[in-house]
Structure formats: C-alpha cells, structure tokens
C-alpha cells in the first residue's frame, strides 16, 4: 500500500518538512495589508465602526430606580450599539406601554406647539437623527402618525425607544396606529422574522397587543385632522372616530380600515375648485393600489374639512421624494387641503428620498428635512454570514472537486459501457491466455478488472459530489423555501427535499402545504373540560330523546 502511495502523484507532507515550518520570529499581532499598511490583529480593523454590545443590561440600568420607568437615555445608547434586552425587560416595557396607551381615547385632542412625524419603518439610526432635527422630546411635544415597524432591520429598537419616550413624557408624546401595526402585515413583512431572530414569539405577541391599543387619529389645535392613512366615506364628523372599537386587529373594511389604509387619488391636484366641483364626480373610489379601503378625492377632502371646520388633513402612509408633499389648496381657506409626511430617509436603502418633520408653533408651520444616517448592515431575512455564504462556498468547493476528480472520459464514466467493455476485454485476454498460456496475460486481465473497479468507484464519487453540489445550489437559491419547510416541520428539513433540486423542493412544499391545511383543525385551541362535559350532556340528551320517540313493542 505504501509503495502505491509513493509511486502515485499524491505527495505526503510530513510535519517535519522544512518548507512548512512556521517562522517563530514572526510577530503574529501584526498583519501587513496588500497596500503595505500594517494593522494590529488585536484591534478592530475599521475603528470608525462602533463595536457591538454583547452584554444584556441589568434591570437597574434599564429602569429608573425612582420612577420605575424605562431609562430612555440608556436605551438610546444601548440600541445604538445594537444591544438587546432580556425577554423579561422587553415584555415589561411593552406591557407598561399597553396599559398607558389603552387609557387614551381613539381621537387625541392636542395643542400646539408640536412636531408631527411620518413613517419610521424600523430605521432606528434615522429616528435618532429625527430627534436631532426636531428637538429634545423632553422639551418638545411630538405626534407620530404610525408605521414604526416593518421593512427596516431595527423595528424593535424603534418601537421600544418610542414607547420609553412615551412613558416618560405622558401628556406630551403621542403615537397613532399605522396600517403596519398589526399581526397580518408584520407576519407578511419583516417584523415577525426580526422578533423571532432577536427574541421569541412571546415578545412578538406582546408587541401585537400593544399595537391594538394605539389611538387612531388626532385633532391638532382644533384645526388639523391627523391620521395615518386618510378619510373615509363613513367619516362625517371627527367624533365618529371615538365610536370605533379599536382594541382589535385592523379589519379589511370599514372606518377603522380606511383611517389607516386610505390614500389620495393620483390626480388629486387636477381637480376643480369649490363651486366648480363636478357633481357627478366620485368622492371616493376603490383603492386598487392597496387592495382594500378607498382613494379619496380633493372634493371629498374639502367637503370633510368644511363640515368639521378644519384647515387641513395631515397624514403619512406614502413615501415622498422630498419627505413631504403639500397638495392642492382649499379655495375657501387658501391652505393645502392635504399634507403627507414621511420620516424614513432613503426608504429601504433604495429610494434615495429625504425625510421630513412638520413643526407647528405660533400658527407657523415649518417643514424640516434631513438625510439618511449610516447604519449597520443586515443580510436578508436576518441571516448570519455562515447561513448566507455556506451554500455558495459549498457549491464552489464541490464544483472544484468534481473538476479535480473528473479525469475520465464520458465513455469511461458511462455506467452501461463500462462493465461490457471490461468484460469483453477480459474475455479476449482469457482466450489469448488459453492459446498462449502466458502468465503475464492473466495479470493483465486482473489489472483491467481492477482498473474498471477503480473507475466505477471514481464515477460513483463524482456523482455523489455532484449531488452534494446540487443540494448546496438549491440551499443557496431557494433558502427562503428551505427555511419555511424547516419551520413548518419542527425545525427539520423533510427527507429527500433537496435531492431532486428546485422541482423536488417545490413538490415537497406543495405536498406539505396540502397536508398542513388539512390538519389545521388540530391547530385550534382544544375545548376546556367544562365544554367537554357540556358536549357529553347534549349527546346523552339527544340519545334519550331518540329513545323516547321509538314506538314501544
């Protein structure tokens, strides 16, 4: 065996070989880059990037010892360094916020001066910039119009920091509900995934409970109707808002849905003015863009403002290139009938838009714009670098191994041709041996069979590695489906799901979905013991009644 190894092309590297000895004098604390710059291996290569906080803070740090309220100053810095809270601390802040918010009416009535902000969407580092531009919340009143979570990677940090400011500034800091503050949308977009990555389902449920108690609208200075989405055909008076049962999930239709989902029509500014309104013109049309609620017209806005003695509607809900948009002026008041605010700069890291806040003070309205702030990068779906890169690396490594091992021709690797060719060759050698009786011919025949066996083993290895390569490729390209299958199958990928590539994965997913739907009845909450007893009583009563109705023999 050793002789075969030495005669092969494989070089056995021994530990005492001179060319693999480590230079003991080399300073391993220093590393020279390609450009000649020497850096320390003990320090962070890019010192300008803040280090991540890995420590879970104590309760004394998170909560004020005197008031018991969240320490928003500490949380601000802790979240800035990507720190996390314990599960108990997070739930405590969420429960405190739920209690405080539930005591507020559906329609808030606020006074100026106040700063009004639009969508935040999980952009925590831009939220900190917002407070730099808008002013210290301890000194200035704030009204947020909703959509604190989803899309951005720091939704939880935004929510908890805003809640901590709310709890410390009751009567001065106000938060409305947006259409993303619900289980339906947060499950579809990113917030639920973020919560399961950073915490767990219990913390996510606590967040959703807090969403259900957020107020729906605000009347600012008795002149401005502030809401996340817009107005509704069911909204005749601002007081109609107080008639809504808001302590629930957002419905798919009705006044509550419209307040959070409605948009102005695309040609809002092209409408006629005042008495020139076209009587046949619709005030509300189906909102095809959103798939629910309505799109309201300039005519609808003017009618609502006139009926309630208001100047303007201030809302959020739509990204704006400048961070805000002033719509067509109301001819009666000479003031914009509608204002849209958006406070998430460079939305989704792709829009390149500015953000803005509206500062209203002494009957003067100022709009302050700001640009995005640098923020830590997260991979899609909160993947870690190993989960993200391993399938790619594995695919390339196996591809390289296939290339190295693929030293046989296609004919040699053909499973049908190999045994036949080997058999024919051996038979020919055997016949020749019988005729000549030469021992060397017998050895040659044995060598041919051995070569064919090796070739077959090599072919099987190549096919096995190619199969692994294919599985890595599927893992990389279909990572979302793979993760979903694992989630729905107790964290384990069903056997054979990757073997047949993307097609097989899709079939597995389809089959699994069908089975899951059929089994949904078992996902319901089981009946209580009292309910079981009631069902038994009803069953026995039904049997007795049936027995009484039978004729006596």
Swiss-Prot record:
GO terms for biological process: calcineurin-mediated signaling; cellular response to pheromone; conjugation with cellular fusion; fungal-type cell wall organization; intracellular monoatomic ion homeostasis; positive regulation of DNA-templated transcription; regulation of cell morphogenesis. InterPro entries: Calcineurin-like_PHP_ApaH, Metallo-depent_PP-like, MPP_PP2B, PP2B, Ser/Thr-sp_prot-phosphatase. This is Serine/threonine-protein phosphatase 2B catalytic subunit A1. SUPFAM superfamilies: Metallo-dependent phosphatases. It catalyses: O-phospho-L-seryl-[protein] + H2O = L-seryl-[protein] + phosphate; O-phospho-L-threonyl-[protein] + H2O = L-threonyl-[protein] + phosphate. Binds 1 Fe(3+) ion per subunit. Binds 1 zinc ion per subunit. Zn(2+) binds at residues 147, 179, 228, 317. It comes from Saccharomyces cerevisiae (strain ATCC 204508 / S288c). Fe cation binds at residues 119, 121, 147. GO terms for cellular component: calcineurin complex; cytoplasm.
């Amino acid at each position: 065996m050793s002789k075969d190894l030495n005669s092969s092309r494989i070089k056995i590297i021994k530990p005492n070989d001179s060319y693999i000895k480590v230079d003991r004098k080399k300073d391993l604390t220093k590393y020279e880059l390609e450009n000649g710059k020497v850096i320390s291996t003990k320090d962070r290569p890019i010192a300008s990037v803040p280090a991540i906080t890995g420590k879970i803070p104590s309760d004394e740090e998170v909560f004020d010892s005197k008031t018991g309220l969240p320490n928003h100053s500490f949380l601000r810095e802790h979240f800035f360094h990507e720190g996390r809270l314990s599960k108990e601390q997070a739930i405590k802040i969420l429960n405190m916020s739920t209690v405080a918010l539930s005591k507020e009416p559906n329609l808030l009535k606020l006074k100026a001066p106040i700063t009004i902000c639009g969508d935040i969407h999980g952009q925590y580092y831009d939220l900190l910039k917002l407070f730099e531009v808008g002013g210290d919340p301890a000194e200035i009143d704030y009204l947020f119009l909703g959509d604190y979570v989803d899309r951005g990677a720091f939704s939880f940090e935004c929510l908890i920091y805003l809640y901590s400011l709310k709890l410390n500034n009751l009567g001065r800091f106000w938060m409305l509900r947006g259409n993303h503050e619900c289980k339906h949308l947060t499950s579809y977009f990113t917030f639920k995934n973020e919560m399961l990555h950073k915490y767990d389902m219990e913390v996510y449920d606590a967040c959703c409970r807090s969403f259900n108690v957020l107020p729906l609208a605000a009347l600012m200075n008795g002149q401005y109707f502030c809401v996340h989405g817009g107005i509704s055909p069911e909204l005749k008076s601002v007081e109609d808002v107080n008639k809504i049962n808001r302590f629930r999930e957002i419905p798919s239709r009705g006044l509550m849905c419209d307040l959070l989902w409605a948009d102005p029509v695309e040609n809002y500014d092209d409408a006629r003015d005042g008495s020139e309104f076209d009587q046949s013109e619709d005030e509300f049309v189906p909102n095809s863009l959103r798939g629910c609620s309505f799109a309201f017209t300039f005519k609808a806005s003017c009618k609502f403002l006139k009926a309630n003695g208001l100047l303007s509607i201030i809302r959020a809900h739509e990204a704006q290139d400048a961070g805000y948009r002033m719509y067509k002026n109301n001819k009666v008041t000479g003031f914009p009938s509608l204002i849209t605010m958006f406070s998430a700069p460079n939305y989704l890291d792709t829009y390149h838009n500015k953000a803005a806040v509206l500062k209203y003070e002494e009957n003067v309205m100022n709009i302050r714009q700001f640009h995005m702030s640098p923020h830590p990068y997260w991979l899609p779906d909160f993947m870690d670098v190993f989960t993200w890169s391993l399938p790619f690396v594995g695919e390339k490594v196996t591809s390289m191994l296939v290339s190295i091992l693929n030293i046989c021709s296609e004919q040699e690797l053909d499973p049908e041709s190999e045994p036949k060719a080997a058999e024919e060759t051996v038979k020919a050698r055997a016949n020749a041996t019988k005729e000549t009786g030469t021992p060397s011919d017998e050895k040659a025949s044995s060598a041919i069979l051995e070569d064919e066996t090796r070739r077959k083993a090599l072919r099987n290895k190549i096919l096995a590695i190619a199969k692994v390569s294919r599985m890595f490729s599927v893992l990389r390209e279909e990572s979302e489906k793979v993760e979903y299958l694992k989630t729905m199958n107790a964290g384990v990928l069903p056997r054979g799901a990757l073997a047949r590539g993307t097609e097989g994965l899709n079939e597995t997913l389809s089959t699994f979905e069908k089975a899951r739907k059929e089994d949904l009845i078992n996902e319901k909450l089981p009946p209580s013991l009292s309910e079981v007893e009631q069902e038994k009583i009803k069953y026995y009563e039904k049997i007795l009644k049936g027995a009484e109705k039978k004729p006596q023999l």
